Design a protein with these regions (language model features):
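A short N-terminal beta-strand-loop micro-motif at the entrance of redox/enzyme domains
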Residues: 20-36
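Glycine/small-residue-rich phosphate/adenosyl-binding loop
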Residues: 33-39, 43-110
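Short secondary-structure boundary segments
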Residues: 88, 133, 159
Length: 187
């Protein structure tokens, strides 16, 4: 019988320790760091290995300022060193759950790619935070993706204005206890 491999401490530590950073230093991302973040997203698993995503990287300050208008809580995009828009085939048009573009599969896969990028950034000393897109027409106009594509989330990245933000303790309340959220075999 095969014994499960223990989770390496650095992986679990990163999962448990990553924090949202909304206040960024006025400093561009090192191109190698940006490439590693993008590679982390590229290496995410996906349903049927379709990799149904395109990443649009924005580094221009003017563009980032305009992107900050795509949602009521997207203001952090204006101060980011870079943003990565996560673009997929429009999941609202993918209604057949047996098809290659099943809406839940597309969004699940996108979440996997996003989390890989967030964890890679954290490991590099780079903060991040997601922005939900509410103004879809504005996002399409600014980013230029075709009508059959959709952007629901944009990730902000930057070196934190306060490096302690990457390692600060969780806010009071933290995570729910495992016993509150896990059921075995049945509810």
């Amino acid at each position: 019988m095969h014994e499960p491999r223990p989770v390496p401490d650095p992986v679990f530590r990163a999962i448990a320790a990553v924090r949202v950073v909304r206040d960024f230093a006025d400093r561009p991302l090192d191109p190698d760091h940006l490439d590693r973040i993008l590679q982390a997203g590229r290496h995410a698993g996906s349903s049927k290995n379709l990799q149904r995503w395109t990443f649009i990287v924005c580094r221009d300050r003017g563009q980032l300022g305009e992107l900050a208008k795509v949602g009521p809580w997207a203001g952090h995009l204006a101060g980011a060193a870079a943003a990565i828009a996560l673009v997929t085939p429009d999941p609202r048009g993918a209604l057949d759950p047996r098809g290659d573009g099943a809406p839940l599969s597309i969004m699940w896969d996108l979440g996997r790619a996003a989390q890989n990028m967030v964890l890679a950034a954290w490991e590099l000393g780079i903060g991040s935070v997601p922005a939900t897109v509410y103004e879809h027409d504005l996002a399409r106009e600014l980013l230029g993706y075709p009508d059959d594509q959709h952007c629901e989330y944009i990730l902000s990245f930057g070196y934190p204005a306060d490096p302690g933000d990457l390692t600060r303790a969780p806010k009071a309340g933290g995570r729910r206890d495992l016993e509150e959220m896990v059921r075995y075999e049945r509810w």
